Amino acid sequence: MASLPKPTPLLKDELDIVIPTIRNLDFLEMWRPFFEQYHLIIVQDGDPSKVIKVPEGFDYELYNRNDINRILGPKASCISFKDSACRCFGYMVSKKKYIYTIDDDCFVAKDPTGHEINALEQHIKNLLSPSTPFFFNTLYDPYREGTDFVRGYPFSLREGVPTAVSHGLWLNIPDYDAPTQLVKPHERNTRFVDAVLTIPKGSLFPMCGMNLAFNRELIGPAMYFGLMGDGQPIGRYDDMWAGWCIKVICDHLGYGVKTGLPYIWHSKASNPFVNLKKEYKGIFWQEEIIPFFQAATLSKDCTSVQKCYIELSKQVKEKLGTIDPYFIKLADAMVTWVEAWDEINNNKSEETTSTKASEVAATK
């Protein structure tokens, strides 16, 4: 008896799964029921001569550092090395509307009833339903089945806005900074909160890249994970840097960012002493970085993500460059990233090609 064909999953031909890695991707076996019909973009970090083994049956393309250098040329300098921030190269070369990115130490979680959670499906539902950043709904996501807008919610805002980002959570190993890891080495996250909420306009959040989905067409050019890792004075701030940038831009352009479901199972705790070395400067710098982003505003001329990001890069150079020369280098890399994005995506815009030569140079 012939087996029935597998049902086509949501957005099968409109979504890429991006995975940064330095090891064989055996973890994909657990995700096979949910990922097998999607296209994978694997960004190999570290030694490009190492062969990364991918389980049979997956449709994928794999890029190592040699590929990144070949494709981007001198602009490859904006892509981090020996850091999971390299994943953003996968965002750049994707041709799909949506991206889901996951770390290779993350596995399928189970809900309180024992059922395996299809994290990707929940992310897609989050992205395809509107967000409510301008007025908080006390029943959280009003578009989920079994809920609605509460009494007193303005009818003029009930249509919502497009969702740009879906930020998922994790069970087991929490995403803590090194000092918290050191004082709570045995703590595990066992709380499953069945909720999705929109992060209000004007509020920042610490974005984690291990279980993250976004609309690439809406916010992709701003989803840059910065300069981290090899040769840089800081690490483990890549996803948070991107999160602060995209939140300022989403607030300006009128897009929404959701957090909550879905959960994944985070299996491996990283070394807190290694993490402390990576985070040390960032722990101090963030006390100035956060107020910078809280106060950041973009001009009315910023009508595209690229324009927003270029303007934000100039503010980074001007206001954070006084903290450390690293931020001047980072601001330049932000411009390089946008230029590379537009070149790769055949969308070379006038504002990105002219800015580096004139406006940004004038701020040096």
Curated annotation (Swiss-Prot):
Top EC class of this enzyme: isomerase
Catalysed transformations (reactions): UDP-beta-L-arabinofuranose = UDP-beta-L-arabinopyranose
Domain of life where this protein originates: Eukaryota
Naturally occurring in which organism (per UniProt): Pisum sativum (Garden pea)
Assembly mode: Homopentamer or homohexamer.
Regulation acting on activity, per entry: Inhibited by inhibitor protein (IP) which may be a form of sucrose synthase.
Record keyword Cell wall biogenesis/degradation present: yes
EC number in record: 5.4.99.30
Residue positions of motif DXD motif: 103-105
Keyword terms, alphabetized: Cell junction, Cell wall, Cell wall biogenesis/degradation, Cellulose biosynthesis, Glycoprotein, Golgi apparatus, Isomerase, Secreted
GO cellular component terms, A-Z: cytosol; extracellular region; Golgi apparatus; plasmodesma
Entry PTM: Reversibly glycosylated by UDP-glucose, UDP-xylose and UDP-galactose, but not UDP-mannose.
Subcellular location: Secreted, Cell wall; Cell junction, Plasmodesma; Golgi apparatus
Cofactor dependency: Mn(2+); Mg(2+)
The record's note on its domains: The conserved DXD motif is involved in enzyme activity.
Any matching Pfam family: RGP
Record bears the keyword Hydrolase: no
Gene field: UPTG
Record function comment: Probable UDP-L-arabinose mutase involved in the biosynthesis of cell wall non-cellulosic polysaccharides. Was initially shown to possess an autoglycosylating activity which is dependent on the presence of UDP-glucose and manganese.
Site feature: Required for activity: R151, R158
Gene Ontology BP terms: cell wall organization; cellulose biosynthetic process; plant-type cell wall organization or biogenesis; protein glycosylation; UDP-L-arabinose metabolic process
Annotated glycosylation sites: R151
UniProt name for this protein: Probable UDP-arabinopyranose mutase 1
Gene Ontology MF terms: UDP-arabinopyranose mutase activity
Family label: Belongs to the RGP family.
